[in-house]
Amino acid sequence: MANVVVIGAQWGDEGKGKITDLLSRSADVVVRYQGGVNAGHTIVVDDKVLKLHLIPSGILYKNKTCLIGSGTVVDPKILLKEIDMLIDNEIDISGLKLSSTSHVTMPYHRILDEAMEADRGSNKIGTTGRGIGPTYADKSQRNGIRVRDLLNKERLRDVIEIPLREKNGLLEKIYGIKPLKTEDIVEEYLDYGERLSKHVVDCTRTIHSASKNKKNILFEGAQGTLLDLDHGTYPFVTSSNPISGGACIGAGVGPTLIDRVIGVAKAYTTRVGEGPFPTELQGSINDQLCDRGSEFGTTTGRRRRCGWFDGVIGKYAVSVNGLDCLAVTKLDVLDELDEIQVCIAYDLDGERIDYFPTNSDDLKKCKPIFKKLKGWQCSTANCRNLSDLPQNAMNYLRFLAELMEVPIAIVSLGANRDQTIVIEDPIHGPKRALLR
């Protein structure tokens, strides 16, 4: 038995969906432990492109328990759309489970998210406008609505009274928006609750039962390390904890239950929205990476900012997550480049530093110090073994592993499942040196 956490080692969009889908074959239970519909992952199966925001990637395999954990925030309207999409594609959803204590994104959360972001003007943080931040804020203020509340009319009417009164006051007096009606929301969300009721479970009990029965559990994070509320580039972060420690809180398990942590990183770096980005590129190479990598957000459709691989944030991700190994994705996007650069340190006010400054003002001043490597200028899309890779591609991967001081277990060379080199299965394989 092995319990594995999959995290993003950059600013999200690293390709965690594909890696989680790949590892789900060896897992019995797949748990999404934080975030909401602000995250998105794309999986390509038999030329079918499936885009999911809440449902764990393991749903595409039969006989898997796929659990949306207590640390998530759930927009039931979008969740039901995902369920319908999967049913339309003849995918069995009987293994889908939803924590009764997950908090629910309500209509006023989405409206407030958009209004607050617009009000920030030039100081906007780049929110997706899906209501995630306001939902987590209500959770922290003990003013939130949980999935269990959608299963009882009187309960829902009771718990919604205070937050709706507060939110209507904000909508009317601050933003000049028409207030929402209690009955409209209650009826709509009771309907959602009824449709979702057969999936609702006690999250912690479900996971601990699986663990007791020696099942393999895969914990799936959303977003990435640099978007972590406490350890990311604050305030340009998400409202939850995507790092590996967040799996324990969001799923309701102790750290001793985690056997291994795998980080997912692109062979270059991307970021969506606002905030400092030391290795960001401009011009033709930026456009080339964006176009070849299809760098447009699954959730928002926004064009992603592209840059060279940043080893400083990579080493930071290794540290704060306790990474055991790494999955490098989109290596094929670099195929046509004759020269590739990797950031090995920063220049901060004339001083060379090799650590990640968590102060966004300092990070904004950091200038990348690069190491140049030779490109391979040939396609890697059909490589299925390390021996198939061009020598310079191998050199590049080894350099990343040495720089980050963590072995590489998986290399992804395209969107399809089979466009992958699995050096070692992090769930069933022994802990040993992989590609260094």
From Swiss-Prot:
Pfam families: Adenylsucc_synt. PROSITE patterns: ADENYLOSUCCIN_SYN_1, ADENYLOSUCCIN_SYN_2. Mg(2+) binds at residues 13, 40. It catalyses: IMP + L-aspartate + GTP = N(6)-(1,2-dicarboxyethyl)-AMP + GDP + phosphate + 2 H(+). Keywords: Cytoplasm, GTP-binding, Ligase, Magnesium, Metal-binding, Nucleotide-binding, Purine biosynthesis. Pathway: Purine metabolism; AMP biosynthesis via de novo pathway; AMP from IMP: step 1/2. The active site is at 13 (proton acceptor), 41 (proton donor). IMP binds at residues 13-16, 38-41, 128, 142, 223, 238, 302. PANTHER family: ADENYLOSUCCINATE SYNTHETASE. Belongs to the adenylosuccinate synthetase family. This is Adenylosuccinate synthetase. The lineage of its organism: Bacteria, Bacillati, Cyanobacteriota, Cyanophyceae, Synechococcales.
